[in-house]
């Protein structure tokens, strides 16, 4: 079984809308000009780098934005141009919400369980409903369509519908999920949550907790996971209030290794004790304290929103944002991870600033899917990374993406036409078929 990182292509409407309360980077860059072409090329460069390390790499397409489907559902009628013009005039905030390129953060696209862990021996995928934020909730339908197109062979894959789109079952996807495993032990799934729909638990006071316990429990049932191999740790309210709106802002795990901040989970010490019992002596964890790495620095530099990757030689490497190198406390923590008795032997720093400015580091940009060779062969879409695909996608970006996008540019109907033209071509490049509503 091999891990594949399905990275989200940054969409043509990448902009700084400041749409997510609790996402400090998003709020601090609101209204600034963005650079969609650079953003997409930075994402492709990360894919190239990860693939060159010998790690499985694939791609997921962006979604059509502005979402004319969503705007029409909100009462704007007429031609595409009339819908956009009227929304810009009457409810500019709705145009911003429906123009977000946030689907690039595919860690929120779905939660995935490998066939080795599921009762029916299939890979299970559930698109996240993302119901807490409107600009993200409108992604779920298209995500479901895309995943069904890629993972279409029902002998190997079970693609579920998103959980019911209510606050009771608010689901943020794999950004709150970690799978750990050691040789000779069953994989352990951490399905974290920040609040409960029915239980009285202490929550954050400054920023909203997005994922519910009930959603995490439903995912475990849908994916047919053994109850003994699932843990439901609560996100630390203080961590959420510091800006860790998803678990992957303060924790990241891979196979037998977990690195986390002490504010990632309530009772992290108790959680680690249970993990050692379930995973055995090969399990390794490194904890950053508030004294060593203040939460504000962790949220600013995103050392935990790194990718921890298993290399072909069995060692691990961290792919971190360049901000982690530029922030002394974050850099020193990552250096300690390498120096200690862990599988991690190297840290690589990459420039994904266009995404970071909106609150998304390397880990946000990828969805992990574990596949056997047979399962990999059952996927017929051309989504797996090759140098030839890289060149094709880079050329596609340069042909279709604007160099600079300013807030007022979202009001230009031509932008929607450019995006649909680009995505129509992309579905042919990736051999996806008609996955978008404008293609049907």
From Swiss-Prot:
Record field: catalytic activity: N(2)-succinyl-L-arginine + 2 H2O + 2 H(+) = N(2)-succinyl-L-ornithine + 2 NH4(+) + CO2
Name of encoding gene: astB
Keywords: Arginine metabolism, Hydrolase
Originating organism: Myxococcus xanthus (strain DK1622)
Similarity field: Belongs to the succinylarginine dihydrolase family.
Pathway(s) per entry: Amino-acid degradation; L-arginine degradation via AST pathway; L-glutamate and succinate from L-arginine: step 2/5
Keyword Oxidoreductase recorded: no
Protein's name in the database: N-succinylarginine dihydrolase
Disordered as annotated region, ranges: 17-37
Molecular function per GO: N-succinylarginine dihydrolase activity
Isomerase is among the record's keywords: no
Function according to Swiss-Prot or TrEMBL: Catalyzes the hydrolysis of N(2)-succinylarginine into N(2)-succinylornithine, ammonia and CO(2).
């Amino acid at each position: 079984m091999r891990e594949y990182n399905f990275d989200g292509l940054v969409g043509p409407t990448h902009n700084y809308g400041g749409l997510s309360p609790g996402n400090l980077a998003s709020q601090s860059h609101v209204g600034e000009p963005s650079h969609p072409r650079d953003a997409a090329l930075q994402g492709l460069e990360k894919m190239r780098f990860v693939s060159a390390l010998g790690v499985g790499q694939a791609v997921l397409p962006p979604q059509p934005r502005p979402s004319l489907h969503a705007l029409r559902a909100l009462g704007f009628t007429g031609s595409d141009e009339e819908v956009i013009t009227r929304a810009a005039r009457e409810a500019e905030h709705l145009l911003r919400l429906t123009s977000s390129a946030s689907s690039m953060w595919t860690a929120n696209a779905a939660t995935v369980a490998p066939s080795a862990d599921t009762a029916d021996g299939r890979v299970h995928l559930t698109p996240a409903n993302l119901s807490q934020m409107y600009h993200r909730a409108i992604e779920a339908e298209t995500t479901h369509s895309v995943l069904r197109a890629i993972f279409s062979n029902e002998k190997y894959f079970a693609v579920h519908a998103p959980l019911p789109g209510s606050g009771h079952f608010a689901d943020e996807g794999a950004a709150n999920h970690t799978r750990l495993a050691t040789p000779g032990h069953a994989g352990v799934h951490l399905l974290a949550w920040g609040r409960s729909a029915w239980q009285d638990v202490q929550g954050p006071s400054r920023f909203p907790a997005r994922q519910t316990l009930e959603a995490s429990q439903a995912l475990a049932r849908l994916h047919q996971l053994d109850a003994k191999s699932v843990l439901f740790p609560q996100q630390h309210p203080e961590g959420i209030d510091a800006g860790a709106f998803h678990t992957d802002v303060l924790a990241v795990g891979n196979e037998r290794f977990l690195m986390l901040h002490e504010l990632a989970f309530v009772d992290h010490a108790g959680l680690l004790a249970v993990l050692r019992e379930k995973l055995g002596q090969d399990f390794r964890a490194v904890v950053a304290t508030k004294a060593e790495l203040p939460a504000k620095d962790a949220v600013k530099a995103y050392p935990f929103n790194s990718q921890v990757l298993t290399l072909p030689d069995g060692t691990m490497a961290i792919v971190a944002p360049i901000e982690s190198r530029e922030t002394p406390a974050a850099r020193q923590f990552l250096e300690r991870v390498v120096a200690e008795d862990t599988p991690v032997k190297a840290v690589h720093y990459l420039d994904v600033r266009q995404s970071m400015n909106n609150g998304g580091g390397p880990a946000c940009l990828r969805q992990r899917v574990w596949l056997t060779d047979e399962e990999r062969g059952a996927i017929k879409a051309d989504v797996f990374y090759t140098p030839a695909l890289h060149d094709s996608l880079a050329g596609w970006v340069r042909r279709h993406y604007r160099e600079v996008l300013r807030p007022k540019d979202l009001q230009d109907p031509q932008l929607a036409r450019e995006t649909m033209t680009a995505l129509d071509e992309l579905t042919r490049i990736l051999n996806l078929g008609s996955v978008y509503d404008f293609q049907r």
